Amino acid sequence: MKCRLIATGECAPSWVAQGFAEYQKRLSHWMPLELVEIEPGLRGKGRDAQRATDDEGRRVLAALPKNAYVVALDVPGRPLSSEQLAQRMEHWRGQGRDLAFLIGGPEGHAAEVLKSASESWSIGPLTLPHMLVRLIVAEQLYRAAAMLANHPYHRA
């Protein structure tokens, strides 16, 4: 099973890139994790935010692997504990499909992206910088994989 993190936004700060790379490397023992950065839509004075979100959505949909199980990161999505995420990962592995996790832009996901998702996952009600969400998702995927492998990383 391969995993693709499709994230709207480019040019992550070095601390995000370094942290993501660390969890990407650790996770590679169990599951390859690929980061695909989507160019954000144009925003600003006089620009239509909905149009920017729809443009991002088209780029996200184009980046989806064929037949992947798609999980959209979304505030109203299903909250999961680390243990529940590990259970979901075990279920996804059993399906034999690749995974795609989607992180939207400032206004969230386009409606078409949410329709294409197999499920949505909320990492909590806090408003977080999208770059930080990349790091949190990578760490939680590593934690879940480590739990499934009986690795001592997770201590709860």
Swiss-Prot record:
Q: What species does this protein belong to?
A: Xanthomonas euvesicatoria pv. vesicatoria (strain 85-10)
Tell me the HAMAP family matching this sequence. 23SrRNA_methyltr_H (MF_00658)
Coarse class of the primary localization is cytoplasm
Lineage, top-rank taxon, reads: Bacteria
Please list the reactions this protein catalyses: pseudouridine(1915) in 23S rRNA + S-adenosyl-L-methionine = N(3)-methylpseudouridine(1915) in 23S rRNA + S-adenosyl-L-homocysteine + H(+)
Supply the Gene3D superfamilies for this chain. Answer: 3.40.1280.10
Recorded GO cellular component terms are: cytoplasm
Function description: Specifically methylates the pseudouridine at position 1915 (m3Psi1915) in 23S rRNA.
PANTHER family in the cross-refs? METHYLTRANSFERASE (PTHR33603), RIBOSOMAL RNA LARGE SUBUNIT METHYLTRANSFERASE H (PTHR33603:SF1)
Per UniProt, which keywords does this protein have?
Cytoplasm, Methyltransferase, rRNA processing, S-adenosyl-L-methionine, Transferase
Quaternary structure per UniProt?
Answer: Homodimer.
**Name this polypeptide is given:** Ribosomal RNA large subunit methyltransferase H
Query: Where does the record place a coiled coil?
Result: none
Q: What is its EC number?
A: 2.1.1.177
* Similarity comment: Belongs to the RNA methyltransferase RlmH family.
GO MF, one term, reads: rRNA (pseudouridine-N3-)-methyltransferase activity
Which residues of this UniProt protein bind S-adenosyl-L-methionine? L73, G104, I123, G124, P125, L126, T127, L128
Q: Where in the cell is it found?
A: Cytoplasm
